[in-house]
From Swiss-Prot:
Cofactor(s) it depends on: Mg(2+); Mn(2+)
Gene, per the UniProt record: MOD1
Function: The chloroplastic ME isoform decarboxylates malate shuttled from neighboring mesophyll cells. The CO(2) released is then refixed by ribulose-bisphosphate carboxylase. This pathway eliminates the photorespiratory loss of CO(2) that occurs in most plants.
Pathway: Photosynthesis; C4 acid pathway
Identification of the protein by name: NADP-dependent malic enzyme, chloroplastic
GO biological process, one term: malate metabolic process
Cellular component, GO annotation: chloroplast
Family (UniProt): Belongs to the malic enzymes family.
Organism: Flaveria trinervia (Clustered yellowtops)
Binding site for a divalent metal cation: 339-340, 363
C-alpha cells in the first residue's frame, strides 16, 4: 500500500496555476480516502490510502511513501471495485466519503452551469478568452434578442401547456436573465404558463416532473433546526419569502409538498412583473404531511412526507419556529407572503403575525385589492359609486371574505359610515346557503361579520332573486356554478351586470367568458381569475379581463421594499387597488376590459409601488429615509433588469 502523509492538499486555481500556501484548502479532519493510481491506459493499478493531517506544514516538505506489496499487480475491473476518477464514482465506492469541490469565481465549464451568470452563446469573444470558455461553445456569438426569439420559437413548438412550463423552468435553472427577458417581453403569452392555470397541473404532477430544487423544503423532521436550514440557502440578502404548506393549492385542494410550484411561480412574477431581484426571493414549502389519500397511497413519485397532515399545537410550534427564524436571519424588513394555506390556518396566521412581522396573504389581501381595482374600473362603465352597489358572493373562504372586507372598508372611507354599517351592502353564500344571523353559532369566526338579518335561503339562485345584487362575485373554487339561469337572472335585474368568476384554475371557474357574454346577450361586464380567449357575439369582439393577483402583489411587494416598510396596513391595500384602474383607457372599456393589458404591467407595478410606499411614509411605517421626491421614478430605478452584464 502507498501511504501519503501530507500537511495539506494543494488545489489548482480556476486559471490553472497552483495555489499559494495561504490559498490552499485546509482539511479539518484526518480521514483516509481510498483512491487509486492509474496506468497509461487509465486503469487502476494499486489501492492508495491517502491521509491528510489537519496541521499545516511546509508545502515543500518531503512526503513519505510506503508501497504495500501485498496488493496484486493486476488492475481491478472498474465494475468490480476499482475507482475510476477523483470522485470515486462506481458501485464499489458508493458508501465512501467524497468532497464536492467548488470554486468561488465561476469560470469555464462551471460558468456555463451557473444560471445567475450564464449567457450561453451571448458570451463575447473577449469574455470567452477571459473566462476559459474557448472551445466550450460553438464559435458563433448570438445577441440577447436573438436568443429570446429562438426560445419563443422552441416553446411554441410544444402543444401541451405542461411541456411549455417545463421548458420555462429548465430555462430558469440554466440562464436566469434570458428567462426573465423572455417572460417580460412575452408576458401575456407566458403568464398562463409559468402561473395559473398551468402551474396547477404542474403542482399535481410535481413529483413526476421534479428535477432540481428551486427553493427550501422545511418539514416536521426539521423542527429545532429551521434557522440552520435557512443558512443553507446560497443567497443571504433575502427581501421576499413566499411560503405555503400546500393544503389549499389554487382550487385543487391538498397537494402537500408538491405545492412548491406556487411559491416558485409567484416569485418569478415578483421579479418579472415587479422588478424584485431574483437573488432576493426565496420560495419555501412547509411540509407537515398531507391528507390527500392519492398522494399518500398511490403516488410512488410523491416527494413529501408520507403521513397525515399535522395540526394543532404541533403545527403551531413549527410555524412559530419558522416565523422567528426568518425574522432573525433576514431582519425586520423581510416580506413574508403566505400562499395557499387552508382557511383555518390562513386567517389565524395573518392575525397572529401581522403585528410582529411584515406579512401579507395574497389569497386574502392580494385578491381583495385586485378585485377592488376592477370594481373601481367597472363603475366607470356602469355609473354610480361603490356604496350604490349591492354585492353577492358565492364562496365565503379566504378570497371571498377578504374581498368583502376590503370593499366594505373602501365604502366606509368614501361615505364616512361605520365599517359595520358598510358591511351590510355585502352578502355571502357558502355551501349551506346565505350567511344570515340565525346561523351565527355554527359559523367560522371569519364568516361571522357577514351574518346579516334575513330569513335563511338555501339555494344560490334563490339568494340572487332575493338579494337582487348588482355585482356577482364567485370565489367558490367550484366550476360551472354560474349557470345559464344565474347569468340570465343577473341580466334581468341589471342593464350591465358585473360578473366576476374568480376561481382558479380554468377548470374551476364559475363560468367561461363565452357563457357570460352569450347568456347576458353581450351586456355583462365580465372578468375572471383565469384567462379566456376573446369572444365574438353578435358581430362584436369582447375581450374579458383577468382579475389576476399578478396585477397587485409584485408592485405591492416592491413598494414595501423601497420604503423599508415594517408592517402591512389595510390603507396600503386600498392605495394599491387604485393604480390598475387608473391605467384602463376608453379603448380598453370599448372592448369590455376593466383591467389594463399585461403588456404594461411593469409600469403598473411601478405606480402601485409608489402608492404603497407613499402610504407607508404617511403612516410612519417606512424605515428607509428620507422619502424620495418622485416615488414612481424611484421605483422604476430599483427594478431588476434582465439585461446581460459585461464580464471582465
Amino acid at each position: 500500500m502507498i501511504s501519503l502523509n501530507s500537511s495539506f492538499l494543494e488545489r489548482s486555481s480556476v486559471t490553472g496555476g497552483s495555489r499559494t500556501q495561504s490559498q490552499s484548502l485546509r482539511l479539518s479532519a484526518r480521514r483516509p480516502v481510498v483512491t487509486s493510481m492509474l496506468n497509461s491506459n487509465s486503469l487502476p493499478e494499486r489501492n492508495v490510502s491517502v491521509s491528510v493531517d489537519s496541521a499545516v506544514r511546509d508545502v515543500n516538505a518531503p512526503v513519505a511513501v510506503e508501497v504495500d506489496r501485498s496488493v496484486g499487480e493486476k488492475p481491478f475491473a472498474a465494475v468490480g471495485g476499482g475507482v475510476e476518477d477523483m470522485y470515486g464514482e462506481d458501485t464499489a465506492t458508493e458508501d465512501h466519503y467524497i468532497t464536492p469541490w467548488s470554486v468561488s469565481v465561476a469560470s469555464g465549464y462551471s460558468l456555463l452551469r451557473d444560471p445567475h451568470h450564464n449567457k450561453g452563446l451571448a458570451f463575447t469573444e473577449k469574455e470567452r478568452d477571459a473566462h476559459f470558455l474557448r472551445g466550450l461553445l460553438p464559435p458563433v456569438v448570438v445577441n440577447h434578442d436573438l436568443q429570446v426569439k429562438k426560445m419563443m420559437h422552441n416553446i411554441r413548438q410544444y402543444q401541451v401547456p405542461l411541456q411549455r412550463y417545463q421548458a420555462m423552468m429548465d430555462l430558469q435553472q440554466r440562464n436566469e436573465r434570458l428567462f426573465y427577458k423572455l417572460l417580460i417581453e412575452n408576458v401575456e403569452e407566458l403568464l398562463p404558463i409559468v402561473y395559473t392555470p398551468t402551474v396547477g397541473e404542474a403542482c399535481q404532477k410535481y413529483g413526476s416532473i421534479f428535477e432540481n430544487s428551486q427553493g427550501l423544503f422545511i418539514s416536521l423532521k426539521d423542527k429545532g433546526r429551521i434557522l440552520e436550514i435557512l443558512k443553507n440557502w446560497p443567497h443571504k440578502k433575502i427581501q421576499v419569502i413566499v411560503v405555503t404548506d400546500g393544503e389549499r393549492i389554487l382550487g385543487l385542494g391538498d397537494l402537500g409538498c408538491q405545492g412548491m410550484g406556487i411559491p416558485v411561480g409567484k416569485l418569478a412574477l415578483y421579479t418579472a412583473l415587479g422588478g424584485v431581484r431574483p437573488s432576493a426571493c426565496l420560495p419555501i414549502t412547509i411540509d407537515v404531511g398531507t391528507n390527500n389519500e392519492k398522494l399518500l397511497n398511490d403516488d410512488e413519485f410523491y416527494i413529501g412526507l408520507k403521513q397525515k397532515r399535522a395540526a394543532g399545537q404541533e403545527y403551531a410550534e413549527l410555524m412559530n419556529e419558522f416565523m422567528s427564524a426568518v425574522k432573525q436571519n433576514y431582519g425586520e424588513n423581510l416580506l413574508i407572503q403566505f400562499e395557499d394555506f387552508a382557511n383555518h390556518n390562513a386567517f389565524d396566521l395573518l392575525e397572529k403575525y401581522r403585528t410582529t412581522h411584515l406579512v401579507f396573504n395574497d389569497d386574502i389581501q392580494g385578491t381583495a385589492s385586485v378585485v377592488l381595482g376592477g370594481l373601481i374600473s367597472a363603475l366607470k362603465l356602469v355609473g354610480g359609486s361603490l356604496a350604490d352597489q349591492k354585492f353577492l358572493f358565492l364562496g365565503a373562504g379566504e378570497a371571498g371574505t377578504g374581498i368583502a372586507e376590503l370593499i366594505a372598508l373602501e365604502i366606509s372611507k368614501q361615505t364616512n359610515i361605520p365599517l359595520e354599517e358598510s358591511r351590510k351592502k355585502v352578502w355571502l353564500v357558502d355551501s349551506k346557503g346565505l350567511i344570515v344571523r340565525s346561523r351565527l353559532d355554527s359559523l367560522q369566526h371569519f364568516k361571522k361579520p357577514w351574518a346579516h338579518d334575513h330569513e335563511p335561503v338555501n339555494e344560490f339562485l334563490d339568494a340572487i332573486k332575493t338579494i337582487r345584487p348588482t355585482v356577482l362575485i364567485g370565489s367558490s373554487g367550484t366550476g360551472q356554478t354560474f349557470t345559464k339561469e344565474v347569468v340570465e337572472t343577473m341580466s334581468s335585474l341589471n342593464e350591465k351586470p358585473i360578473i366576476l368568476a374568480l376561481s382558479n384554475p380554468t377548470s374551476q371557474s364559475e363560468c367561461t367568458a363565452e357563457q357570460a357574454y352569450t347568456w347576458s346577450e353581450g351586456r355583462a361586464i365580465f372578468a375572471s381569475g383565469s384567462p379566456f380567449k376573446p369572444v365574438e357575439y353578435n358581430g362584436k369582439l369582447y375581450v374579458s379581463g383577468q382579475a389576476n393577483n399578478a396585477y397587485i402583489f409584485p408592485g405591492f411587494g416592491l413598494g414595501l421594499i423601497i420604503s423599508g416598510a415594517i408592517r402591512v396596513h389595510d390603507d396600503m391595500l386600498l392605495a394599491a387597488s387604485e393604480a390598475p384602474a387608473e391605467q384602463v383607457t376608453q379603448e380598453h372599456f370599448d372592448k369590455g376590459l376593466i383591467f389594463p393589458p399585461f403588456t404594461s404591467i411593469r409600469k403598473i407595478s411601478a405606480h402601485i409601488a409608489a402608492k404603497v410606499a407613499a402610504k407607508a411614509y404617511e403612516l410612519g411605517l417606512a424605515s428607509r429615509l428620507p422619502q424620495p421626491e418622485n416615488l414612481v421614478a424611484y421605483a422604476e430605478s430599483c427594478m431588476y433588469s434582465p439585461k446581460y452584464r459585461i464580464y471582465r
